[in-house]
UniProtKB/Swiss-Prot annotation:
This is UDP-3-O-acylglucosamine N-acyltransferase. Pfam families: Hexapep (PF00132), LpxD (PF04613). Catalyzes the N-acylation of UDP-3-O-acylglucosamine using 3-hydroxyacyl-ACP as the acyl donor. Is involved in the biosynthesis of lipid A, a phosphorylated glycolipid that anchors the lipopolysaccharide to the outer membrane of the cell. Its EC number is 2.3.1.191. It comes from Trichodesmium erythraeum (strain IMS101). The keyword Repeat applies. The gene is lpxD. One of its GO terms (cellular component) is membrane. GO terms for biological process: lipid A biosynthetic process.
């Protein structure tokens, strides 16, 4: 594909393109690659000026650049085709989609799969080897279910959803349209509900359900527990990384992103567009407002206001954390100073 044709297929955020100025920079693009691994005939991208050194050495034939005239000039001097955007990473993601097509199996119900007579399976559905579909399950059109998936009774799965191999969807769970569940995930397993008694722990039955709204993606070995009563809900287009634990009764808003090893205790509520970085822990019943961010390994014990950024454990506003970190580095120096002052008293 000519670079000019590729550029025309990318998003509206493209502002400047070398093809408008230097017509001979219209290489053939045969694929995409990381900037440090790119070969002639590939497209790559640079997200910011701090990666300028890669531009000096890359073998890419074309680049997606930020709105930076210095980078544009350097690319032109090296004979590299380029286009600039306010969102270079987004455009590169779009470019990948032009070259990469995920594996799409031919619709069929494998001979070794087991489908209960009361289950309803839509059109153009793929059920791989050893899939188990229990009583009362409803599967929409164009759903793809890979081998060894187990779907418990009365589950509903929306159209165009993908369940990867070896995941489990427990009873009464509702999976929306266009969701992706990766291998090893457990959706709707029992929440951690036990009541202490003098004789030991009394098990509280978990009669609720899990609801994933449309466009939710759940990473490998992530678990989303159902509650004793009511529902655990994951909002539209929210993305969960691998190894995330969502406790019983949590309510997560739309367009949230939770990185690996995040853990939410029971009853946590997240607003829309919340970001939790790796290994963030959120305590029981805590509320986090819209657009809030918790940085890596934050321990959130209290509510977080909308738009706030918190860090550390226990979590504090990020500005306070940064100041405290600067002081922490100077503690040996401060200690020596205090020690000397005490001698003078």
């Amino acid at each position: 594909m000519k670079f000019s044709k590729l550029a025309s297929k990318l998003g509206s955020e493209t502002i400047t393109c070398s093809l408008e100025k230097i017509n001979h920079l219209d290489p053939d693009i045969q694929g995409v690659a990381a900037i440090d691994e790119a070969k002639p005939g590939t497209l790559s991208y640079i997200e910011g000026a701090k990666f300028a050194n890669y531009l000096k050495t890359t073998n890419a034939s074309a680049l997606i650049l930020p709105m930076d005239e210095t980078l544009q000039k350097l690319a032109g001097e090296r004979g590299i085709g380029w286009l600039s955007s306010k969102e270079p990473r987004l455009l590169f993601a779009q470019a990948i989609a032009l070259f990469y097509r995920p594996f799409q199996p031919t619709p069929e119900i494998h001979a070794t799969s087991i489908v209960h007579p009361t289950a309803k399976v839509g059109k153009n559905v793929y059920l791989g080897a050893h899939v188990v579909v229990e009583a009362g399950v409803k599967i929409g059109d164009n759903v793809c279910i890979y081998p060894n998936v187990v779907i418990y009774p009365n589950v509903e799965i929306g159209e165009n959803t993908i369940l990867n191999a070896n995941c489990s969807i427990h009873e009464r769970s509702q999976i929306g349209k266009g969701c992706v569940i990766h291998s090893g995930a457990v959706i709707g397993g029992e929440g951690f509900g036990f009541v202490p008694t003098p004789e030991g722990w009394f098990k509280m039955e978990q009669s609720g359900k899990v609801i994933l709204e449309d466009g939710v993606e759940v990473g490998g070995n992530t678990t989303i527990d159902r509650p004793a009563v009511g529902e655990t809900r994951i909002g539209k287009n929210t993305k969960l990384d691998n190894l995330v634990q969502i406790g019983h009764g949590c309510k997560i808003g739309k367009n949230c992103a939770l990185a690996a090893q995040v853990g939410l205790a029971g009853g946590v509520k997240l607003g829309d567009n919340v970001i939790l970085a790796g290994q963030v822990g959120v305590a029981n019943q805590a509320k986090i407002g819209d657009r809030a961010i918790a940085t890596a390994q934050a321990g959130v014990h209290n509510d977080v206001a909308a738009g706030e950024i918190v860090s550390s454990s226990p979590a504090v506003p990020n500005k306070i954390y940064l100041k405290a970190s600067a002081i922490y580095k100077r503690l040996p120096e401060i200690y020596q100073f205090v020690k000397q002052m005490k001698r003078k008293l």
